[in-house]
Amino acid sequence: MLATIFLTVFIDLLGVGIIIPVLAPLFLNPMSGILPVDYQSAILTRQLLLGLLISVYPMAQFFGAPILGAMSDRFGRKKILILSLVGTCIGYLFFGAGIAAASLITLFISRAIDGFTGGNISIALSAIADISDPKEKAKNFGLIGMAFGLGFILGPYIGGKLADPSVVGWFTHSTPFWFAAALTFLNIILVTFRFPETLKNRVQTRISALTGFRNIAKAFRMPNLRTMFLVVFFLTIGFNFFTQFFQVYLIEKFQFTTGNIGDLFAYIGLWIAFGQGVVTRIASKKFKPQQILSVSCVMLSASLLALLIPDKSWMLLIVLPFVAISNGLTQPNSTAMISNLSSKESQGEVLGINQSIQSLGMAIPPIIAGIISTIDRILPIFMASCFVFLAWVIFLAFYSNRKQEVFQ
């Protein structure tokens, strides 16, 4: 059963990884043709539009993911996962068409569709929570991270090549999105015929378009969870300052091409897969999630700051493994802690709340980064380190006040 969930998530994240090398060059390269001529000389306008486009997905996910999470508690994981994948497939098709037609509005609509239906990962996490005992959750959630890493090994590499006309003459910036849509369609078939229904006891949870806002309010009314939700919020803001605008940093400082970005993110994905698939599984046998998190957060903050040191692109290859492995430890263990502090019947709802918080945390950085990166290209990465460090401080304050055993 875990193997099927792993393969489903891997194919989904392969599609996500494919588009990583495309967005920044699409907006920052004046020759891409996606922006009108009068925008080409205004770097602030181009970077702000890039930031706004990136933020559309998580903002739409903020509204959609908790609805899908609640629906999965009511109707089962499988049906809602299929619905989510159909929306993702449509989103990719619209985005490819938007690039081909040089239509900004189509690009924004496509990301909104994909974001609103983008509950794939939270539903997969709920499925794993359904079949895992508390001691196995961090290890099994690490499988999601390993699938994430493997998707990011192959995805960016494939995306960089599919957008490069020097590889094949008819390749354009649209090609990776057509390919991602085809992959998602294959995933729909896989889930339909191979994904088992894991939810045994269905509950009548409330479904509303305002669930995202209610989730934020509800998160801070949960004594056992509110501090961990705050930690996750700042961790998400911090890491997304890095992931969403690191491409801009690479283009401006090291003159990276789409292919270069794809290759480097494939390298990052290799280390993420190693961190979550190997290091997390070993660490979870010897340490509790809160012990791992207390070390991985400060390690992540320090390694993000260290990214500003290299003045040669090859030097990034030394620093990035520390970023990837520390993030690989942080993600599954923070999710495991939140899951362990929740009842088995509320896993879908609580992980949906967690997804709302992460979506909000993902929506904030690109808009701010689009502005501050025009002041200095290092600022988004510096902000990434600061927010992760803040999350670590809050977590330490939380853990030091919880002497009793609350994490199973």
Tell what function each PLM region has:
Residues F10, G91, S103-G119, M315-L329:
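Hydrophobic core of transmembrane alpha-helices in multi-pass small-molecule transporters
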Residues P21-Q47, Q244-I261:
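Short amphipathic helix-loop junctions that connect adjacent transmembrane helices
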Residues A65-G76, A163, G275-P289, S373:
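Helix-to-loop junctions at the C-terminal end of transmembrane segments
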Residues V86-A101, V298-D311:
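C-terminal ends and interior cores of transmembrane alpha-helices
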Residues F108-A147:
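Cytoplasmic helix-loop-helix junction between adjacent transmembrane helices
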Residues A182-N201, I394-Y399:
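C-terminal membrane-cytosol helix-exit motif in multi-pass small-molecule transporters
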Residues P196-L230:
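Juxtamembrane intracellular "pre-TM" segments in multi-pass secondary transporters
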Residues Q290-S334:
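C-terminal transmembrane helical hairpin of 12-TM major facilitator-type secondary transporters
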